[in-house]
Amino acid sequence: MEVKRFVCNMIRENTYVVSDDTRDAVIIDCGAFYDMEKAAIKQYIDDNQLVPKHLIATHGHVDHHLGDRFVFDTWGLKPEVAGGDEDLMERLPEQAKEICGEQLTADDFAPVGRYLTPADTIDFGHSRLTLIDAPGHSPGGTAFYSEADKVLFTGDTLFRGSIGRTDLEGAQAP
């Protein structure tokens, strides 16, 4: 499994492109807002001849969805989002103003493809990501785990050296 991280948008959110030896790929938490961020992700995917199969999100805060429309327009993928964050997803334009100071509309975001449950898996190429419920930062917070590669994508549930933020909409402190 190959993992490439991109630091995106005004919040400095982590976007990941994950691929395997088949060149199938998954884009996780696409926060690409600026043109240079979108160009870097597209160039990486093109240069490595990757084929994005899924756009998945660990939760429904706007900084993890600012690039969803770019992915939808470029590769036709709709975001697959943790169930429990439906209200957050419906409020993306409002979140953009509150959290990022940006005036965006619903048309600036891709339509949700489906809401995920813990029973779902994300399969691409020879790889599989399983879902782990990780509420706290948001009601539907989800981590994606590759057992074969021992890799865990936590979104904002965990930060280096600490737990994730619990002061945003929908969060619950432990």
Residue ranges and their predicted role:
Residues 1-4, 76, 166, 173-174:
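Accessory terminal helices/loops
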Residues 1-48, 143-155:
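Conserved beta-strand hairpin/beta-sheet module of binuclear metal-dependent hydrolase folds
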Residues 6-7, 111-114, 133-135:
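Short Gly/Pro-enriched turn/cap motifs at secondary-structure boundaries
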Residues 10, 22, 107-108, 159-161:
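Short glycine-enriched loop/turn motifs at secondary-structure junctions
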Residues 18, 29, 59, 71, ...:
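Divalent metal-coordination and catalytic microenvironments
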Residues 32-34, 95, 121-174:
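Metallo-beta-lactamase
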Residues 33-124:
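Active-site HxH/HxHxD metal-binding segment of metal-dependent hydrolases
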